[in-house]
Amino acid sequence: MTFSIDIATVWAFIIAFAVFVYVVMDGFDLGLGILFPLFPAKADRDVIMNSVAPVWDGNETWLVLGGGGLMAAFPLAYAVLIPALYTPVIAMLIGLIFRGVAFEFRWRTTRSTRNRWDIAFAGGSWLAALAQGIALGAILQGVHVEGRHYAGGWWDWLTPFSILTGLSLVIGYALLGATWLVLKTEGELREKAYSTSWYLLFAMLAAIGVVSIATPFLDIHYAHRWFTWPNVILTTPVPVAVAVVTVLLLRSLADKKDAQPFFLTLALFALSYAGLGISMYPYIVPQSITIWQAASPESSQIFMLVGVAGLIPLILGYTGWAYWVFRGKMRPGSGYH
């Protein structure tokens, strides 16, 4: 008996994993930027930024791995998606640059200019999060492909559905940021994070519901994947799990737990991501290009897999160590800047 591994599927999983880790790890510090206007006091803002200062730089590593892996392992998908998403991708990069520069320069300025960097930090976070969500919606609604090339227009990405997914991701990141503050802060700042988390949770549940209802109407493939027999046996556990996690998250907020709200919010993101995977598989460009059609030669994928097999455990190990070293509450007057 022979045993074979589908290298294209392995690479699809690696890229999906890298993107998910980026979303949850960079999501909460983008969420902190989104929430920044709600915390006008300098002392609170210092605590907020110090809570992520030791780890935020490494979060973009996963975005580079996901984007680089897509270009190397699935060059056809990369060649189609990037022209289709030029505007939101460029907007995302501009937002990340503004946020990164503001994060560092805020600590090196006088009071008169600090507010400008605070605005840049919040604005960059909003722009990056919104652009990521819009790009996701644009991919889900489908990309016009003819002869292995993008054949759509410059503004095809901008639709009511993509705006909906963009705002939904902003809300989700904000909830991640609020529950991160619950985990990492104390006193009045923590209490305000609790109350903010309640509003954001209900907003996120509404967003999940609206996106989930709208998605099957984008393409008949999505409806068949979720609602036809016997697929429904495999897809039903996802909304059931969302309901269970929601109840647990509500209870954890009501009981004012420290860690549970953050990790249960991560679980909501994981379930939403699983739903996205169910909808898209086996397409990497929905309804146009499958992962096997987009794959680079198997020899190239195997060559790259050797390097990635050692790189990912190294990044995971370093990331885990960094979070472990800098665990615990962040208090006013303490920090890394």
Where are these regions (language model features)?
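Juxtamembrane membrane-water interface segments of multi-pass membrane proteins
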Residues: 30-54, 72-80, 104-115, 177-196, ...
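Long, contiguous internal "core" modules enriched in hydrophobic/ aromatic residues
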Residues: 105-257
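N-terminal signal-anchor module of multipass membrane proteins
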Residues: 1-58, 64-67
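Alpha-helical transmembrane segments
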Residues: 11-22, 82-94, 122-126, 156-170, ...
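Short, membrane-exposed interhelical loops at transmembrane-helix boundaries
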Residues: 285-304
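Central hydrophobic cores of alpha-helical transmembrane segments
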Residues: 262-270
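Helix-coil boundary and interhelical linker segments in multi-pass alpha-helical membrane proteins
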Residues: 1-13, 71-86, 140-160
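Membrane-interface helix-loop-helix modules in multi-pass inner-membrane proteins
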Residues: 55-127, 146, 222-233
